[in-house]
């Protein structure tokens, strides 16, 4: 039966008088021998069709190489365990920078330790910070310069008193007053004094009041 109108399907009559009909029949027979499935599909019922090959995934080298890794990561496995997932993250090497920083820190700490040993009369149980060490060293240098200015050979390091108290906002004002007192003391004491010499007692009294 034909699909159009339900009329019976008339068979095709081949006429030997037409040369192209014989050529077409020969080509159809060769096609049937080479690909019988395709020929059978052409003459079979319209509802029967070959599988749709357009829906099948095309071959891709990237998909083939990374398929194993993708499957593992999709089902909770370890990502990157397939053939294409063997890449490792580059590790930054900072060993050289760390060694340089460590050597620099050790050098600075050793220099401050040597400077603390040069400051006299510092209690043994006192821990001096770096800024406090620099301030005490500056004060001690000023004291030694004052001794040289007075040309006093009897000055001793025991006369220097290391100040351990915390500095306040009025530190600049206190330094100015201390310098004025030192200048007045130098002017009044023209003659050399015998015995131990050092900072005047009233200067230390002023220091203790701060």
UniProtKB/Swiss-Prot annotation:
Pfam families: HLH. Keywords: Developmental protein, DNA-binding, Nucleus, Transcription, Transcription regulation. Residues 81-101 are annotated as: Disordered. Its main location: nucleus. PROSITE patterns: BHLH (PS50888). Residues 92-144 form the bHLH domain. GO terms for biological process: heart development; regulation of transcription by RNA polymerase II. Heart, liver and spleen. The keyword DNA-binding applies. It is found in: Nucleus. Efficient DNA binding requires dimerization with another bHLH protein. This is Heart- and neural crest derivatives-expressed protein 2. It comes from Xenopus laevis (African clawed frog). The lineage of its organism: Eukaryota, Metazoa, Chordata, Craniata, Vertebrata.
């Amino acid at each position: 039966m034909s699909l159009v109108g339900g009329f019976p399907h008339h068979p095709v009559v081949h006429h030997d008088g037409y040369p192209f009909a014989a050529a077409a029949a020969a080509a159809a027979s060769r096609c049937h021998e080479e690909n019988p499935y395709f020929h059978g599909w052409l003459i079979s019922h319209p509802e029967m069709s070959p599988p749709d090959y357009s829906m099948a995934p095309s071959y891709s080298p990237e998909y083939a190489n990374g398929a194993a890794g993708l499957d593992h990561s999709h089902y909770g496995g370890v990502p990157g365990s397939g053939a294409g997932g063997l890449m490792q993250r580059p590790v930054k090497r900072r060993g050289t920078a760390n060694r340089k920083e460590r050597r620099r820190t050790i050098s600075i700490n050793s220099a401050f330790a040597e400077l603390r040993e040069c400051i006299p009369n510092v209690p043994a149980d006192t821990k001096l910070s770096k800024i406090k060490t620099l301030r005490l060293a500056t004060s001690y240098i000023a004291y030694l310069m004052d001794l040289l200015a007075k040309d006093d050979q009897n000055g001793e390091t025991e006369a220097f008193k290391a100040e351990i108290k915390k500095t306040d906002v009025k530190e600049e004002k206190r330094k100015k007053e201390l310098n004025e007192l030192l200048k007045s003391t130098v002017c009044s004491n023209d003659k050399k004094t015998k015995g131990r010499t050092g900072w005047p007692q009233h200067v230390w009294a002023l220091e203790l009041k701060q």
